[in-house]
Swiss-Prot record:
The keyword rRNA-binding applies. NCBIfam families: PRK05309.1, uS11_bact. One of its GO terms (molecular function) is structural constituent of ribosome. This is Small ribosomal subunit protein uS11.
Length: 128
């Protein structure tokens, strides 16, 4: 039987600037903060911060997720970030404001939402 190797503690990186990716859907918001090479420094989602079900899609849940990810990134020495926002969700602006409120300096905001050139058929309208 193969012996399990012991993993060492996670090494703290000293990363002064990075990129924050905010993926905001109707059901959840995921905030990932990377270094300039694209290696993940910290991440958080509305679900990982304790929200369940329909509450994950709210702007407040996005704010909490952004604050959590930003706090972890600042522990690794991050000061400046570029923000890439993707998706149509409710938590887009709130997540950006939360990143700014934690003390990170935002140098750039870019919308990278993929727009189809008439690709897949969208879901039908809800009738309640």
């Amino acid at each position: 039987m193969a012996r399990q190797q012991r993993r060492g503690r996670k090494v703290k990186k000293n990363v002064p600037n990075g990129v924050a990716y905010i993926q905001s859907t109707f059901n959840n918001t995921i905030v990932t903060i990377t270094d300039p090479n694209g290696d993940v420094v910290s991440w958080a989602s509305a679900g990982s911060t304790g929200f369940k079900g329909a509450k994950k899609g709210t702007p407040f849940a996005a704010q909490m997720a952004a604050e959590s990810a930003a706090r972890q990134a600042m522990e690794n020495g991050m000061r400046q970030i570029e923000v890439m926002v993707s998706g149509p969700g409710a938590g887009r602006e709130t997540a950006i404001r939360a990143l700014q409120a934690t003390g990170l300096e935002i140098t750039l905001i870019r919308d990278i939402t993929p727009i189809p050139h008439n690709g897949c058929r969208p879901p039908k309208r809800r009738r309640v």
